[in-house]
Structures are given as structure tokens and as C-alpha cells.
Amino acid sequence: MTRVALVKTRERITGVNRALDLLDLPSFGGKTLFLKPNYNSADPPPGSTHNDVLVALVRRLRELGVGPITVGDRSGMGDTRQVMQRKGIFHLAEELDFETIVFDELEAEGWQRMHVPGSHWRKGFAVAQPVLDAGAVVQTCCLKTHRLGGHFTLSLKNSVGLVAKQVPGDGYDYMSELHTSPHQRSMIAEVNVAYQP
């Protein structure tokens, strides 16, 4: 059974900690952790993950016994490195001792092609290998609708940032396929079978 915690507060750090208390997560036992924020753009929340949320998660997950933490993303609306720079993520990485990955900068071997039976993706889709290699994955979704598709998808759409726009050496544009498909909502959901949160 999946547990869900809802916390209403104006204090993000308090809210993150309270939600994690309610979830009563077991110790991570030193597992590596991939933390997927929403840095589709550097827009203020709810357009992107608030830095207080990221800081609270990193600190609290360390208390719960996670090993090395990596934070990474692929922006859909701009240059990912510039988005993360504008958000101050590289500074936070130094301050809080976590690694960062800009998915746009991964070489071809940094992507794993996924073929989901019955999927609407014509050629499958490519997921960032560091996500698949992590012992645990945590996402920080933004509660917003989406310009392309216009539906409220929570963390399902956030997983699209784990998928390559293009894999180096392969000219196929996965995001063009997704954003022009009449099956866009199904394709977004299908991306989420690639990993276990």
C-alpha cells in the first residue's frame, strides 16, 4: 500500500519535515540517492522546486541514513546548466555536499534506452543511467498544470526530465515526439515505469 502525506503550511522546511515524519520512512541503510527536483525553468515556485524544499530534503534524508546524494535534471525550457546556476544549485551542492548532474551533458553511454511493452513511444525512450543506478529515487514535484497537455500530473510529468531530448550520436528527438503525440498523457505515465521511487 502506498502512503501519502498531506501537510498544509506556509513554512516549506517545516512542511517537508512534517510530511516525512508522517510517511515514517525506514532507514535508507546507506543507499545512494538520486533526488529529482523540477528545474524545467528557473521560474519561481510553483514553476520550479523551491530551494528551501531541496535543502530540507537533503538534510532530512541524510538523517534517515542515505548515502551519497546526486541532484540532477534536464530542463525543457532552456539550458539546464544555466537554469541550475540561476537557481543556485551548484552553490547548494558545495554547501550541503551533494553531487549534481546536468543530463544534457551526459554522453551516449549515460543513457539507457527503455522499451515498455504496449508503450506509445515509437522508439522507446532513453532514461538517464544515474537514475537507474541509484539505490533510491526521490522526486520533488511542483503542483501546477502544464502548458503542453494542460493537465495536473504531479510527479508523473516531473519524470519527463529524466528522459533525453536527444542521445548524443542519435538524432532522434524524444521530446518532439512526446509533445506532438495525441497520446502525450499516456506517454508521460509510461516514463514512470522506468524506475522505482
Feature locations, PLM:
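N-terminal and secondary-structure boundary signal
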Residues: 1-197
